[in-house]
Amino acid sequence: MAPVKGPLTPIQVENLQFPASITSPATAKSYFLGGAGERGLTIEGKFIKFTGLGVYLEDKTVDSLATKWKGKSSQELLDSLDFYRDIISSPSEKLIRGSKLRPLSGVEYSRKVMENCVAHMKSTGTYGEAEAAAIGKFAEAFRNLDFPPGSSVFYRQSPDGELGLSFSPDDTLPEKEAVVIENKALSEAVLETMIGEHAVSPDLKRCLAERLPAVLNQGLLLSGN
C-alpha cells in the first residue's frame, strides 16, 4: 500500500504516551495505533478522568475495512455505528491498552467493565452459561490486583474468540499473558463497550474516526514512535 501523506503518530492522553506502533512479546505480532482517548465519569457535576484507552490494530485490518469505508469522511465514520462494529468484528487481532490516570483496585476496575459487558451481551442475546463462566474467569483475574497511576491492562481480542489479559506496572507489554479466556461474545463485548453504541470513551471513538480515513484511503505509514 502507498504511504499516507500524514503518517500516524503517537498520541498523548494526559501524561500517558501511546506509541504509533507496538509489538507484543507474547504473540510476536505488531499493531498500529488506531486511536486513543480518555475514559472518565461525571461525579457531582465534574468530569473525572480515570483511564487512557488505546486501540491497536493489525495491518490487515486496513484491507478488511477499506472495502466498505474507503473514501468516507471522518464525520461519516463517526456517525456510523456499523464502522465501529466492523472494527470489532474484523478478521484480525485487536490489542487494547487501558492505562490508569488514578489509582484503582482490580475489583473496582473490573466491576464496571463486567457490568458493561454483561449488559451488552444480554441486550444482544449472547449471554448464556458459557458467558457467565467467562465473566467469572475475568473477575478472578483482577481479584488480587491494584492499579496505581501509570499501570496498564492489555486486552488481546482475537477473531477466533480469545480474550488475552496482560497486566503491567507501566506501559510495557509483558512477556506472557496472565490469562486467556475462550469466549467470543465476551472478547468482542470488551471493545464494543469502549467504541460501540454506548461507548465509555467518546474521545476514543472520535480519535479513530479522525485518524483512520487517511490510512484507509492511502495506506499505512508509521512515524514518531
From Swiss-Prot:
Keywords per UniProt: Flavonoid biosynthesis, Isomerase
Q: Annotated site (Important for catalytic activity), which positions?
A: 109
Look up the domain of life of the source: Eukaryota
Xref: InterPro entries: CFI (IPR044164), Chalcone_isomerase (IPR016087), Chalcone_isomerase_3-sand (IPR016088), Chalcone_isomerase_bundle_sf (IPR016089), Chalcone_isomerase_sf (IPR036298)
According to its UniProt record, the EC number is 5.5.1.6
Task: Give the pathway listed in the UniProt entry for this protein.
Answer: Secondary metabolite biosynthesis; flavonoid biosynthesis
The record's catalysed reaction(s) read: a chalcone = a flavanone
- Provide the GO MF annotations for this entry: chalcone isomerase activity
- The residues listed in the UniProt record as binding substrate, with positions renumbered to this chain, are 51, 116, 193
Q: Any one Gene Ontology biological process term?
A: flavonoid biosynthetic process
Described purpose of this protein according to its UniProt entry = Catalyzes the intramolecular cyclization of bicyclic chalcones into tricyclic (S)-flavanones. Responsible for the isomerization of 4,2',4',6'-tetrahydroxychalcone (also termed chalcone) into naringenin.
Family the entry assigns: Belongs to the chalcone isomerase family.
- Any extra remark in the record? Part of the biosynthetic pathway for all classes of flavonoids, a large class of secondary plant metabolites, many of which are brightly colored.
Q: What name appears for this protein in its UniProt entry?
A: Chalcone--flavanone isomerase 3
Q: Which organism is it from?
A: Lotus japonicus
Upper lineage is: Eukaryota, Viridiplantae, Streptophyta, Embryophyta, Tracheophyta
